[in-house]
């Protein structure tokens, strides 16, 4: 569950954690913005005197010790997050070299890398003691740390150079937990001695009728990284509001869409899903990115004022399903499959556990009309997507993710399964 400490008054943290715990989550995730923690410009690379990590440390301790939640941290240095500067401090512009043709931030320029290491050395050392590897057996702690963010969406040269520098900073600063990134092809099945130790994950922001893409894309991710967990870093939990633009509650991402993307991710073989946002919060004191409203309500499961939306109860139901069948689900095989009969808008698939338990997933892609009838599922016969798959970026634009033939989920062969269905719009 995504919940940012810097978007919520500390007096309300405990309530938000309680609600997340009651919804069945075992982990919370947060970005860690550089500009939030080093607001005053240092005198140079070796000056760490202006860092203040006291609030994030309190947030981590509350999550882990009071509520028994694992934690995931994502310190960027670029975080996007509809946040001021994408997490970069404004004072960093003073050190931007003149005469550069390309965008300096996120680049492989050695001066940018040096400042990124300045940040990573500090934040990793500050959080190292909160790692689960430093905790007594049975206690919770940080289980994952992310480097960079959605690097596929940024066109620049030498990405491997920056990623390797960040990896080295994490390890040299005492962090020994697994390192991951998201939507960063340079780390998928890499043969580099360091980047091969970083697993990639996916972000799913899909159209109203495109929830099945989550199943295909997760199956593809598992195929590309067979030894890594299938993790959705950001599973669409809503959308942000824009000044003079559409508000969060006007977005199509309703409770039905929320449920569909969750179940379809599980069909594809997800081993972890992080709803972004599960609680959105507020942009205090102008910390939102340009064009963002003060509210970061996100039409999330837990609203800005702490109320529970319909999405909350869908999340709770999915959590109960996962808790009931976790051992079977996490070791199951399968995915989307061909079907005989059934409505045109019906999509489905099967996952089979080691003990023979079969999980059938069905979804109605028609947002207007309910469907009912009978269908025969044919596990082992792949039902491939008819069109290319897209993600929706922060500008509302479609970004091509994978060609239609990319996913391969023909991993099980069991007898056909006959199912009667009655699915709402």
Give the positions of each predicted feature.
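A generic structural signal for short coil/turn motifs at secondary-structure boundaries
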Residues: 8-9, 38-40, 46, 152-157, ...
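Aromatic-lined substrate-binding rim segments of carbohydrate-active enzymes
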Residues: 12-85, 167-172
């Amino acid at each position: 569950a995504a919940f940012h400490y810097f978007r919520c008054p500390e007096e309300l943290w405990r309530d938000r954690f309680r609600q997340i715990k009651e919804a069945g989550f075992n982990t919370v995730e947060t970005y860690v913005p550089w500009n939030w923690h080093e607001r005053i410009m240092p005198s140079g690379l070796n000056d760490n005197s202006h860092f203040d990590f006291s609030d994030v440390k309190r947030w981590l301790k509350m999550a882990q010790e009071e509520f028994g939640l694992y934690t995931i941290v994502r310190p960027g240095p670029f975080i996007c997050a509809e946040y001021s500067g994408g997490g970069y401090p404004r004072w960093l512009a003073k050190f931007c070299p003149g005469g550069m043709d390309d965008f300096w931030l996120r680049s492989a320029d050695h001066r940018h890398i040096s400042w990124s290491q300045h940040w990573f050395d500090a934040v990793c050392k500050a959080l190292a003691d909160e790692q689960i590897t430093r905790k007594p057996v049975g206690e919770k702690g940080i289980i994952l740390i992310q480097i960079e963010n959605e690097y596929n969406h940024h066109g620049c040269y030498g990405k491997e150079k920056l990623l390797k520098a960040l990896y080295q900073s994490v390890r040299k600063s005492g962090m020994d937990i697994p390192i991951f990134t998201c939507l960063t092809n340079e780390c998928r099945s890499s043969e580099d001695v360091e980047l091969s130790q970083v697993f990639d994950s996916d972000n799913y922001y899909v159209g109203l009728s495109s929830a099945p893409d989550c199943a295909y894309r997760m199956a593809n991710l598992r195929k590309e990284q067979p030894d890594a967990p299938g993790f959705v870093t950001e599973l669409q939990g809503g959308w942000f509001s824009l000044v003079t633009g559409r508000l969060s509650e006007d977005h199509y991402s309703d409770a039905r869409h929320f449920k569909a993307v969750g179940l379809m991710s599980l069909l594809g073989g997800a081993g972890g899903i992080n709803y972004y946002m599960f609680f959105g919060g507020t942009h205090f004191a102008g910390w939102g990115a340009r064009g963002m409203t003060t509210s970061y309500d996100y039409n999330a499961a837990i609203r800005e004022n702490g109320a529970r939306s319909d999405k909350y109860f869908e999340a709770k139901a999915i959590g109960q399903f996962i808790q009931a069948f976790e051992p079977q689900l996490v070791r199951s095989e399968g995915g989307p499959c061909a079907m005989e009969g059934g409505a045109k808008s019906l999509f489905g698939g099967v996952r089979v556990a080691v003990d023979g338990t079969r999980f059938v997933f069905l979804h109605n892609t028609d947002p207007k009309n309910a469907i009912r009838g009978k269908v025969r599922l044919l596990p082992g016969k792949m039902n491939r997507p008819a069109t290319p798959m897209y993600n929706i970026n922060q500008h509302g634009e479609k970004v091509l993710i994978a060609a239609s033939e990319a996913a391969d989920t023909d991993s099980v062969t069991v007898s056909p399964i006959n199912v009667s269905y009655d699915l709402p719009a």
